[in-house]
Amino acid sequence: MAAVAAVAARRRRSWTGLVLACLGVCLGLTLAVDRSNFKTCEESSFCKRQRSIRPGQSPYRALLDSLQLGPDTLTIHLINEVTKVLLVLELQGLQKNMTRIRIDELEPRRPRYRVPDVLVAEPPTARLSVSGQDDNSVEVTVAEGPYKIILTARPFRLDLLEDRSLLLSVNARGLLNFEHQRAPRVSQGSKDPAEGDGAQPEEAPGDGDKPEEIQGKAEKDEPGAWEETFKTHSDSKPYGPTSVGLDFSLPGMEHVYGIPEHADSLRLKVTEGGDPYRLYNLDVFQYELYNPMALYGSVPVLLAHSPHRDLGIFWLNAAETWVDISSNTAGKTLFGKMLDYLQGSGETPQTDVRWMSESGIIDVFLLLGPSVFDVFRQYASLTGTQALPPLFSLGYHQSRWNYRDEADVLEVNQGFDDHNLPCDFIWLDIEHADGKRYFTWDPSRFPQPRTMLEHLASKRRKLVAIVDPHIKVDSSYRVHEELQNLGLYVKTRDGSDYEGWCWPGAASYPDFTNPKMRAWWADMFRFENYEGSSSNLYVWNDMNEPSVFNGPEVTMLKDAQHYGGWEHRDLHNIYGFYVHMATADGLVLRSGGVERPFVLSRAFFAGSQRFGAVWTGDNTAEWDHLKISIPMCLSLGLVGVSFCGADVGGFFKNPEPELLVRWYQMGAYQPFFRAHAHLDTGRREPWLLPTQYQDMIRDALGQRYSLLPFWYTLFYQAHREGVPVMRALWVHYPQDVTTFSIDDEFLLGDALLVHPVTDSEAHGVQVYLPGQGEVWYDVHSYQKYHGPQTLYLPVTLSSIPVFQRGGTIVPRWMRVRRSSDCMKDDPITLFVALSPQGTAQGELFLDDGHTFNYQTGHEFLLRRFSFSGNTLVSSSADSKGHFETPVWIERVVIIGAGKPATVVLQTKGSPESRLSFQHDPETSVLILRKPGVNVASDWSIHLR
């Protein structure tokens, strides 16, 4: 039997090697991305066409006699005065200081794709009224906000004004370009490019009535309009060119952020002279840094910031999208004279943003702030907030491709206990499944998965197994057979099941845009369907861009067919969103709607925050990749996706011990904390390093677990309000220009400032501490620093600079145990960092840590702690919540305090009691021992 197992193992290794070899052929298995596998704008025909239109007089005119005004919607026709094609514009005022603009063809040959399921609901509207009109413009007032919209007819333009201040302008540069659908012109003797592909455009009513000179005028078929080839792949484009583009001008704005995912700086760069930023979910092998290439996820949201204003643009389109950014001055634009009139003469700095998408309609939300926190809440009201993760998912995750078998998993599990290291999860990659057949277990390596899971559960730990959305084509594989029989796969343009190449070899791809497919997928996670699973098994969705090794740009053909007759080109960027959604729904379903899910996804879109965590993909064990994870996660946080992390240690290559230690130190302060590694890397569990490095990693893990109450509270705030967990400095210091470009340090909430060490052999770092009149305390030494200032701080390998802002209160657990589940009832220590005014405040959220009872039964606590006038008060911050807990306050550490004569505790219904304390005059730290009060109770502590 042992010999048979050995032969089987060799075969599996050979198969994996074959797939890796194929992947190398497809992707260019080198030390960096093979750029030739991915399009530039010049190679993307619609981007090239859109970008060829230069700023100038727009050919579009609004037909004022077509204007119709409803209670909350203005509709008006736009005519392209060259082609005579009519569009229809819908303008809606929305509550919470937002505006929605939609532009579509008035009479399309076939309906255009409108992105479903991303918005949590149709947003509440605000009443519109016409407050002025002349022969070339209409002034519209929005009842819910202090702003007006001026619609100019010729050339078409929209200007949004607040009082006499111009906030932004739409089509000021004349770059609106809407490629209307048209009948393919077939030259004599040639074949219709759509002929015979099963997806011919239907005849549109009235086409025969259009004069030939109008139909053909200025509509030359440029290369790539009706068929496009990239490398060996052909895109049939049966409906012809359908791209859309529109420009937005932002006077007074020089700093823009967002539109992740890119391995680039936090502040977006001007793209003139290079490629635009690309949004097209792709499996990019060993991605390069500091360029605008597309990566695994796309969130089409851009934030603009100035010391006086914040705005957001949400471009709701799931097709391939490019975003051009240029710097300008308002005096050089078409609305410069208006700006002079409104704001006075003189040049105003300005950023221009141009969006270009391959298909769909123009559907854009303008988020008008005025503060960045207003923009966060506005966007969250549209797409939802970050899902509240289970507490245990905020702990440490140990992963690699791959843990060999059950014995290996249990040995790793024991290793954490033997070396006194906390851990919540162990992960299994693709080798755990039987021949890469997801929802199965390799019978020779994992013959008793439930027993293995039970052993992990006895240590209060969990397991994650990968479930990818490519299904092995195998008639004996139940998942494939059912999906094939039910007709739930993505189809080719001739109606057969689409088949590509991925980890299992030949694979088909479930059509997750179909609600029936998502329901089927969710049902697969029931314990009776996912054999060997249990309640402590959670899920990882990888390769869900989708990744197709032999497809164009390592993804699906754009003319593949989805539910409803839509092409893949229309919805590509939302495919991974649906995979994530269906998987999260499945984990909720298996518990009868009781348990919160944990699902990690590589691909994402606007709204993905509702379903779980994401990570920055297949990074490399290099210092620059350590660095780039900061702006990558900060960018995601700005657009609502807070649960972000990077593979600790780097996925590719082997990190030297110094780099691995520095990565653990940073990962401990990023929202999602997972170590992961490639199949060909050496094992790197912490105890395999020399003792001195083990100790440093143990300390980093200890910092993470100590702060879990703080992390959990931050995630509840993100869930409740839509604010990011990990924040760029400028978010809290919007008028401090120094912070606008900082992306090597960050804030956690408003309380902690973290400056990771991201250079080899560093002996010190430059740290910027913001805030006029604010103080910052080193969390290790309690040394006080005043802001704003830049400090050079010496560092050793054993620590990174972390500061607590004066004026905040941070809850901690001080006993680090095997896992977070072992700590959840431990007592709390409050770290009270006093402001120069002697004040501080903070919150603590507690519930059972894993169910929806906080929602369905209001079983939670949200406590507010405030310090003022030498008194610390605990009170309820949400009276709706009620939760019984044994958690009590064990200690209060007040930083920046003088020595009192006495310290008195007051609780309702009890006499005053004195507390013992200790004061260190050198650090001004006062420690109050064992107040002993339950965290759910109201109490106060007085320093006298």
UniProtKB/Swiss-Prot annotation:
Biased composition (Basic and acidic residues): 207-225
Annotated catalysed reactions: N(4)-(alpha-D-Glc-(1->3)-alpha-D-Man-(1->2)-alpha-D-Man-(1->2)-alpha-D-Man-(1->3)-[alpha-D-Man-(1->2)-alpha-D-Man-(1->3)-[alpha-D-Man-(1->2)-alpha-D-Man-(1->6)]-alpha-D-Man-(1->6)]-beta-D-Man-(1->4)-beta-D-GlcNAc-(1->4)-beta-D-GlcNAc)-L-asparaginyl-[protein] + H2O = N(4)-(alpha-D-Man-(1->2)-alpha-D-Man-(1->2)-alpha-D-Man-(1->3)-[alpha-D-Man-(1->2)-alpha-D-Man-(1->3)-[alpha-D-Man-(1->2)-alpha-D-Man-(1->6)]-alpha-D-Man-(1->6)]-beta-D-Man-(1->4)-beta-D-GlcNAc-(1->4)-beta-D-GlcNAc)-L-asparaginyl-[protein] (N-glucan mannose isomer 9A1,2,3B1,2,3) + beta-D-glucose; N(4)-(alpha-D-Glc-(1->3)-alpha-D-Glc-(1->3)-alpha-D-Man-(1->2)-alpha-D-Man-(1->2)-alpha-D-Man-(1->3)-[alpha-D-Man-(1->2)-alpha-D-Man-(1->3)-[alpha-D-Man-(1->2)-alpha-D-Man-(1->6)]-alpha-D-Man-(1->6)]-beta-D-Man-(1->4)-beta-D-GlcNAc-(1->4)-beta-D-GlcNAc)-L-asparaginyl-[protein] + H2O = N(4)-(alpha-D-Glc-(1->3)-alpha-D-Man-(1->2)-alpha-D-Man-(1->2)-alpha-D-Man-(1->3)-[alpha-D-Man-(1->2)-alpha-D-Man-(1->3)-[alpha-D-Man-(1->2)-alpha-D-Man-(1->6)]-alpha-D-Man-(1->6)]-beta-D-Man-(1->4)-beta-D-GlcNAc-(1->4)-beta-D-GlcNAc)-L-asparaginyl-[protein] + beta-D-glucose
Record PTM Phosphoserine, positions in chain: 52
Location(s) in or outside the cell: Endoplasmic reticulum; Golgi apparatus; Melanosome
Annotated spans, Disordered: 181-225
BP-aspect Gene Ontology terms: carbohydrate metabolic process; N-glycan processing
UniProt GO cellular component terms: glucosidase II complex; Golgi apparatus; intracellular membrane-bounded organelle; melanosome
Pathway per the UniProt entry: Glycan metabolism; N-glycan metabolism
Residues with glycosylation annotation: 97
Spans through the membrane: none
Function comment: Catalytic subunit of glucosidase II that cleaves sequentially the 2 innermost alpha-1,3-linked glucose residues from the Glc(2)Man(9)GlcNAc(2) oligosaccharide precursor of immature glycoproteins. Required for PKD1/Polycystin-1 and PKD2/Polycystin-2 maturation and localization to the cell surface and cilia.
Protein known as: Neutral alpha-glucosidase AB
